[in-house]
From Swiss-Prot:
Function in brief: Required for pre-mRNA splicing and for exon-junction complex (EJC) assembly. Hinders EIF4A3 from non-specifically binding RNA and escorts it to the splicing machinery to promote EJC assembly on mature mRNAs. Through its role in EJC assembly, required for nonsense-mediated mRNA decay. Plays a role in the nuclear retention of unspliced mRNAs. Plays a role in sex determination. Required for early embryogenesis and tissue differentiation.
Listed InterPro entries: ARM-type_fold, CWC22_splicing_factor, Initiation_fac_eIF4g_MI, MIF4G-like_typ-3
Acidic residues bias (residue ranges): 447-466
Residue ranges, compositional bias (Basic and acidic residues): 36-54, 93-107, 131-155, 743-897
Tissue expression notes: Expressed in germ cells, oocytes, and sperm cells.
Keywords, comma-separated and alphabetical: mRNA processing, mRNA splicing, Nucleus
Signal peptide region: none
Gene inactivation effect: RNAi-mediated knockdown results in germline masculinization and the accumulation of unspliced mRNAs in the cytoplasm.
Region described as Disordered: 1-155, 444-472, 689-897
Assigned GO CC terms: catalytic step 2 spliceosome; chromatin; germ cell nucleus; nuclear speck; nucleoplasm; nucleus; spliceosomal complex
Protein name as it appears in the record: Pre-mRNA-splicing factor CWC22 homolog
Compartments (UniProt record): Nucleus; Nucleus speckle
Entry keyword Nucleus: yes
């Protein structure tokens, strides 16, 4: 056996060949009984030899198996477990096969290991070589197996879905497949759809929800509803804080495809029941939040909420009560709106649980009791801190909402098979049907994805086939998302600029559209007003814009006019900043002075805020321009229409009010012309009154004189006529002509003298009458002056008006100062409160840090103590082992002795 072991590695193979040859010979010879010598030889074989023979047999069999395996590995692309006998090399025939192939079945004689081992090992190699050569000559060459052609592997059929394929390459591979009904094309479409839905669901938020929904509807939501529901549930589980966003997404899709919303709700209910049975509080709370927001969005019925509350509070524990309160916080506002009686019963149950815990020994945790009390307070506040649906997520009209009345017992099958690809024999037909549905919902406008893989290739854009232009539908964004982004960009641009020139340059480089120019001007004015004090940066920036384009100047003038019309709504800080801004723009002639035309300085048309606003404007103008220059502007005839309201000349009372106002604010020099006008008006009025008095007195005197003169003239006429008649009667026979002429001249002279005397007497009488009327009026005026009610001399009246205006102005100033003091005190109180809160937070933070450091020290001490104990125990154990070892050694020495 030692010589056989020292053979070359070919010895096991030769031994196997020899054994096969012997079996062949034994099968060909007739079965003869063994001789006594053979029996004795087999009996005389030792067990060691039989073991060696069996080992050689096992070695040969193992080598044959390895050879078969190596031959089978030559076929690539086919797993070893699926290889058949046809594709592998022809194996050696076994004993049973040879027996079945032999024409004459003869009983096979069993080989004894003693017989093979009894042979001489020195001649076995030569005999083996001879027999192997004879066998090779006798055997015919076995036909080589035909190798199958290596088929290309389907990347999408592997276990991991294959390596990453860029979207462009995947689209190219999909285009190369002409048959859309083939499994490979549908599988590629499924994989593309799965990746796109996963990416869109992960990107959704409250601002881009509408855009994400439109992009989701570009895919076949009916086929991929399982994927969509799975991705929404997974995304909500990873970020429970966005449960309301995912619920809004589900509500929008549910309004168009109700079966998708029903599948999502069914899966959530099944997941809730599983986690509730496993006592998995984290998963249960997340699922409960999602279901609550679906109830808020009117996807699920409120009966489901009541069933969940009954299940949680039937046998209350710490976890179940905590989950119920978390559920109430999310959907309590909606239940208060649509089912207040049911909500009252739930809170009654919570109150009963709280009372039971206070009475019984098996009380709930103190934290849970505090949560119940907090829930009571939240209900008392009518869920003000937990609104059902925020404004940005309220996208579905009430008539478009579809409510699913699923309960905890109905939801059984989650339909997980929808998550797996299935071949659709009517793929093209279903795609056409969905395309029609999609066009009815969102129209023909295609939304290009933001990912690079979904963009169209340049080759497709430059194709020779010209398509007809598609009608696009205009989408109106009512969420003001673009406006918010624009305001943010403008604000960041101004904050990142060193001075107003750089800010103006950056803003002009933004290429602001015409529709946003008005918004830019309004934002600049708002930013200036929001500052704690006036900053010259904004004034210079607005001045630069006004000088650049006329449109900006008109926008700012319109804003200034609107500001004065709503000045009573603005607080004192904003009012002061706006007044200084307008004064700067007026002093630099950046805007027109016509904005002051709307300001009217009368007692009826002004308010306290308006007067303070005008006061700040003119004080700043005096500081910027000087009193002389400002006075020249006020008296400029080309700007007279701008100051008609501030310096009114239509009513003396209004003029007096304006004079008193500007005198009180220290700008009485601006009212010199108004004072002159008022004085001239008073003089003119006095002259007119005197003229009217004179006219009235002259009318009365002329009437009396006319009556006297008429009487005297009648008597004179009668006497003249009588004298004339007598003279004529006497001189009738011989009328001397010359004497008649002399008499006529004398009579005319007499008449003239009489008329002059009569006129002098009338003038004297008129003067006496006028003097009498003046005396009477003076008496009346003195009588009125003596009375306390109507004593109003002109100078005293002015003094009274001035004192009244001064008192009114003082009261307004006191009110304003009181308001400012109250606001300052309020700001100080708020600042003190904020400071106290910050100090308290800092103290709490320091205390937490001290507690954490103390905990770390305690842990370190415990660790050090434990390590000392461990070292001590190890030392004791080592000492014990050393003592035992020494005892054993001493016992051994004792035995040896």
């Amino acid at each position: 056996m030692s010589s056989s072991r020292s053979q070359s590695p070919e010895t096991p193979k030769a031994a196997s060949e020899e054994r096969e040859e012997e079996e062949k010979e034994s099968s060909e010879q007739p079965d003869t009984p063994k001789t006594s010598s053979e029996k004795s030889a087999s009996r005389s074989q030792s067990p060691r030899e039989s073991r060696e023979v069996s080992q050689e047999t096992e070695t040969s069999e193992n080598q044959e198996k390895i050879k078969e395996k190596d031959d089978g590995d030559d076929q690539p692309g086919t797993p070893n477990s699926y290889r058949s006998r046809e594709t592998s090399p022809a194996p050696k025939r076994s004993k049973e096969t040879r027996e079945s192939e032999s024409p004459e079945k003869s009983p096979v004689r069993s080989r004894s290991p003693r017989r093979s081992s009894a042979r001489s090992p020195s001649r076995s190699p030569r005999r083996r070589r001879e027999r192997s050569s004879e066998r090779k000559q006798s055997e015919e060459p076995a036909p080589l197996p035909e190798k199958k052609k290596k088929e290309p592997l389907d990347i999408l059929r592997t276990r991991t879905g294959g390596a990453y394929i860029p979207p462009a390459k995947l689209r190219l591979m999909q285009q190369q497949i002409s048959d859309k009904q083939s499994e490979q094309y549908q599988r590629m479409n499924w994989e593309r759809m799965k990746k796109k839905i996963h990416g869109l669901v992960n990107r959704v938020n409250a601002k881009n929800l509408v855009q994400i929904v439109r992009e989701l509807l570009q895919e076949n939501v009916i086929r991929s509803k399982g994927l969509l529901c799975r991705d929404i549930i997974q995304a909500q589980a990873f970020s429970p804080g966005f449960s309301n966003v995912y619920a809004a997404l589900a509500a929008v899709i549910n309004s168009k495809f109700p079966h998708v919303g029903e599948l999502l709700l069914r899966r959530l209910i099944v997941q809730f029941k599983r986690s509730f049975r496993r006592n998995d509080r984290g998963v249960t709370v997340n699922v409960i939040k999602f279901i609550a927001h679906l109830i808020n969005q009117q996807v699920a019925h409120e009966v489901l909420a009541l069933e969940i509350m009954i299940l949680m509070l039937e046998e209350p524990t710490d976890d179940s009560v905590e989950v119920a309160i978390a559920f109430l916080k999310e959907c309590g506002a909606k239940l208060l709106e649509i089912a207040p009686a049911a909500l009252n019963s739930v809170y009654d149950r919570l109150r009963a649980i709280l009372m039971e815990t206070e009475r019984s020994e098996n009380a709930l945790d103190r934290r849970i009791q505090y949560m119940i009390e907090t829930a009571m307070q939240i209900r008392k506040d009518k869920f003000a801190a937990y609104p059902a649906v925020i404004e940005d997520l309220d996208l579905i009209e009430e008539e478009d909402q579809i409510i699913h009345t699923l309960n905890l017992e109905d939801a059984v099958d989650p339909e997980n098979g929808l998550n797996v690809f299935k071949l659709d024999p009517e793929f093209e037909k279903n795609e056409e049907v969905y395309e029609e549905i999609r066009k009815e919902i969102i129209g023909n406008a295609d939304i290009s994805d933001e990912d690079g893989g979904d963009e169209l290739d340049d080759e497709e854009e430059g194709s020779d086939v010209e398509e007809a232009p598609k009608k696009t539908t205009e989408i109106i964004d009512n969420t003001d998302q673009n406006l918010t982004a624009f305001r943010r960009e403008v604000y960041l641009t101004m904050q990142s600029s060193l001075d107003y020139q750089e800010a103006a340059h950056k803003l002009l480089k933004m290429k602001i559209p015409d529709s946003m120019q008005n918004e830019l001007c309004a934002m600049l004015v708002d930013c200036c007003a929001q500052q704690r004090t006036y900053e010259r940066f904004y004034g210079m920036l607005i001045e630069r814009f006004c000088r650049l384009r006329l449109e900006y100047q008109q926008y700012f003038e319109k804003l200034c006019q609107d500001t004065y019309s709503t000045i009573h709504r603005i607080d004192i800080t904003k009012l002061r900043n706006l007044a200084r801004l307008i004064a700067h723009l007026l002093s630099t002639d950046a805007i027109d002075w016509k904005i002051l035309a709307d300001m009217k300085m009368t007692e009826e048309d002004t308010t306290s805020s308006g007067r303070i606003y005008i006061k700040y404007i003119f004080n700043e103008l005096v500081e910027a321009m000087g009193m002389v220059k400002l006075h020249s502007r006020v008296t400029d005839p080309t700007l007279a229409h701008c100051f008609v309201g501030l310096f009114p000349r239509t009513n003396p009372n209004s003029a007096r009010f304006s004079i008193n106002f500007f005198t009180m604010i220290g700008l009485g020099g601006l009212t010199l012309e108004l004072r002159e006008w008022l004085a001239k008006g008073l003089k003119k009025k006095k002259g007119m009154l005197d003229q009217l008095k004179a006219e009235s007195s002259s009318d009365s005197s002329s009437s009396s004189d006319s009556s006297d003169s008429s009487d005297s003239s009648d008597s004179d006429d009668s006497s003249d006529s009588s004298s004339d008649s007598s003279s004529s009667s006497e001189s009738e026979p011989e009328p001397p002509k010359k004497k008649k002429k002399k008499n006529s001249e004398e009579s005319s002279k007499k008449k003239e003298k009489e008329n002059i005397g009569r006129r002098d007497r009338g003038d004297k009488r008129a003067e006496r009458h006028r003097d009498q009327s003046v005396e009477n009026k003076d008496k009346d005026r003195r009588r009125r002056q003596d009375s306390d009610e109507n004593r109003r001399p002109e100078r005293g009246d002015d003094r009274k008006d001035r004192s009244k205006d001064r008192r009114r102005q003082d009261s307004d100033d006191e009110d304003r100062k009181g308001r400012e003091r109250r606001e300052d005190s309020g700001e100080r109180r708020r600042g003190d409160r904020d400071r106290r809160d910050r100090n308290k937070d800092q103290e709490d933070h320091r205390e937490d840090r001290r507690d954490r450091s103390k905990d770390r020290e305690d842990r370190r001490d415990r660790r050090r103590h434990d390590s000392d104990d461990d070292r001590k125990t190890r030392r004791d154990r080592s000492e014990e082992r050393g003592g035992r070892r020494r005892e054993v050694e001493s016992d051994d020495r004792r035995r040896r002795r």
